[in-house]
């Protein structure tokens, strides 16, 4: 990587206070984006050099990073599957590694979800967590066109949502879907879901503009650079011990060393201070990183070598998950995209160097 990218990466990940501050938190995000970064680095190493040199080291890093992704966040499994499929079709030399990763990853998840969790009475997460976009559209439709909802549609929706008649007024927030999602019953049947999506599609056909407005209200923060981001402050200030909210309310016995209180306060104050500076503040802006990601894609596609975009695929998938997330422009969801910034810049610089070398050879 060019020297300027190395220094930028060092400053971005260590001196700028966002990632050090998240390092103090005790939530799954930090472990997930660290696993993603290691996955990306080992991914790039395989694409460039294969696994001939230091074969065992590269494979172990790739495997550990893959397992970390699927264990820390549910989206990690989908990201890994898509990445492995792309690797298998466009970079087949290490197909045994991809197959081993997929099989062992499946075995780990099968044991945890089908054996360990049932044995310890641990329930799966609510299905509503993955349906933010359609639920928001249903809630907005009820708010704007409630009088047009037929009795049959109301009966189906009331069976799935606890307070459907008040969903659009009392529970709909254009940028946060949590209140609307909470109205969905915990364990809907396949028949209930089938009927719901029939109603959802029928209402979309009647008023598609309402659905588009609901979706854009929920996602514009990932493309709009003039939006003030939340920086994940509520979660950070709770999990670093600044807020009075006790972690015991979440059945977590977590303590905060009083001798580190000053450091925690310093990190929180620094991030709010740094984000006021021009240009630097863009590094803490979800919309800016969305455009950067699109810039990588355009540049790599323009290189006329489609395989070069493979490294960006994991970041693109994370960004797609952000768009479908329950909170608009939430920087916490963008952390995996942001931490890949130095690696993605390095990859583009490497491709430029390779292109120049190829032209000189000709």
Region locations from a protein language model:
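Membrane-interface anchor segments at the N-terminal boundary of transmembrane helices
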Residues: 218-312
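Short helix- or helix-capping micro-motifs
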Residues: 6-17, 37, 41, 66, ...
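Membrane-interface alpha helices of multi-pass inner-membrane proteins
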Residues: 58-73, 84-86, 103-110
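Short acidic/glycine- and proline-prone juxtamembrane loop motifs at membrane-interface regions
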Residues: 24-31
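Short hydrophobic alpha-helices at membrane interfaces in multi-pass membrane enzymes
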Residues: 3-7, 49-67, 96-99
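Transmembrane-helix signature of polytopic, membrane-embedded enzymes
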Residues: 1-15, 33-34, 53, 57, ...
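Membrane-proximal stem/loop segments at transmembrane-domain junctions that anchor or position
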Residues: 120-257
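Specific aromatic-rich, kink-prone transmembrane helix
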Residues: 33-50, 62, 66, 83-84, ...
């Amino acid at each position: 990587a060019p020297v300027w990218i190395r220094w930028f990466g060092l400053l971005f990940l260590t001196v700028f206070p966002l990632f050090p501050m998240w390092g103090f938190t005790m939530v799954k995000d930090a472990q997930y984006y660290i696993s993603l970064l290691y996955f990306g680095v080992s991914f790039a190493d395989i694409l460039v050099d294969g696994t001939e040199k230091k074969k065992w080291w590269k494979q172990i890093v790739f495997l550990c990073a893959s397992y970390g992704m699927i264990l820390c966040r549910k989206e990690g499994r989908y990201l890994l599957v898509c990445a492995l499929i792309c690797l298998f079709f466009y970079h087949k030399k290490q197909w045994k590694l991809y197959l081993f990763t997929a099989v062992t990853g499946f075995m780990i998840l099968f044991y945890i979800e089908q054996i360990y969790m049932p044995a310890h009475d641990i329930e799966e997460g609510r299905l509503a967590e993955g349906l933010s976009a359609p639920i928001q559209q249903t809630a907005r439709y009820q708010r704007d066109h409630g009088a047009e909802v037929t009795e049959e549609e109301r009966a189906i929706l009331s069976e799935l949502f606890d307070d459907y008649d008040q969903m659009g007024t009392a529970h709909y927030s254009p940028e946060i879907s949590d209140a609307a999602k909470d109205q969905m019953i915990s364990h809907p049947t396949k028949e209930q879901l089938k009927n719901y999506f029939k109603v959802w599609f029928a209402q979309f056909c009647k008023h598609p503009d309402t659905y588009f407005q609901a979706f854009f209200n929920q996602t514009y923060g990932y493309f709009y650079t003039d939006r003030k981001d939340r920086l994940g402050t509520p979660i950070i200030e709770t999990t670093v011990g600044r807020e009075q909210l006790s972690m015991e309310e979440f059945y977590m016995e977590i303590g905060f060393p009083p001798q580190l209180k000053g450091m925690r306060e310093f990190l929180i104050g620094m991030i709010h201070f740094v984000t006021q500076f021009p240009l630097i503040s863009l590094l803490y802006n979800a919309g800016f990183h969305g455009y950067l990601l699109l810039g990588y894609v355009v540049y790599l596609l323009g290189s006329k070598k489609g395989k070069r975009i493979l490294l960006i695929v994991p970041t693109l998938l994370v960004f797609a998950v952000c768009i479908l997330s329950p909170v608009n422009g939430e920087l916490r969801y963008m952390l995996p995209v942001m931490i890949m910034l130095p690696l993605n810049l390095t990859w583009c610089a490497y491709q430029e160097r390779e292109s120049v070398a190829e032209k000189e050879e000709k």
